[in-house]
Amino acid sequence: MTITLPIGLSVTARVPASSANLGPGFDTLGLALGLYDEIVVTTTDSGLQIRVEGEGAADVPWGPSHLVVRAIERGLEAAGVWASGLDVLCRNAIPHSRGLGSSASAAVGGLAAANGLARALDAEIGLTEEQLVQLSSEFEGHPDNASASVLGGAVVSWSCPPAVEGDEPIYSAAKLDVHPDIRAVALVPEERSSTAHTRGLLPELVPHQDASFNASRSALAVVALTARPDLLMAATEDRLHQAQRAPALPLTTRWIGILREAGIAATVSGAGPTVLALSTEPFPVELAEAARADGLRVLELDIADGVEVSTTTV
């Protein structure tokens, strides 16, 4: 049975950005970062009103095809509730198409907002964290960014074949508590990157020794992120995707080289073009100034908790 939500319920979802891969953990490792989109959803008597402020406001659709709206509708359906109308306000701070998980954050934020509306009506209904990971990953097609935004901290994520052929894969993730000394800095170029394009640069087959290398570094990354940050340089090495994408990301590749030569563990953030740097030391002022002079935004970011939802009654 579907329950109709009363008019005047309002929730705010605050959802973090994320960085995927972290070097060796292609489509597996993710990290939640302290840069947030806010999604305010209010139930109304009829229709859909959507407003978008900040990043991407001029580029995304202001209607039912907006990813946040589709995620809200999917979340309401999964929670067994329905709204006669919705007012949706998106306040975006996460840059779009830069490798910081903006689409995953939109999906997670919309689903979490829908879950908040359901639980505002009845605390016994709604979606579990596992369901939020599953549903948001279905939008993405892989769970690394989405699960990081749901759970916070660092995540190891994976997928399994569906129980019924034709269904969605089963997506799962386990949260890692990041060592408190680790700091994150994102160097964000102005140009955008297409995930589809950069994925298209990857070979279908890889040498066994490269697969073995990345398996070892992915395991080491778990140790480095949680207990041994002194191992971050080795733990962020990769042979499967960064060099292959380098021709499409010249500025990114150059800055990864600059930072690693300076002893800072740097990787492509997701599909790029953002550079993610992880360290236990403050980011060098001279490198920050040089990056800005090269047209990069320098964002010093906390390691974030997962999506948060607050509820009010209008």
UniProtKB/Swiss-Prot annotation:
ATP binds at residues 95-105. The keyword ATP-binding applies. It is found in: Cytoplasm. It catalyses: L-homoserine + ATP = O-phospho-L-homoserine + ADP + H(+). It is an enzyme of class 2 (transferase). Belongs to the GHMP kinase family. Homoserine kinase subfamily. This is Homoserine kinase. The gene is thrB.
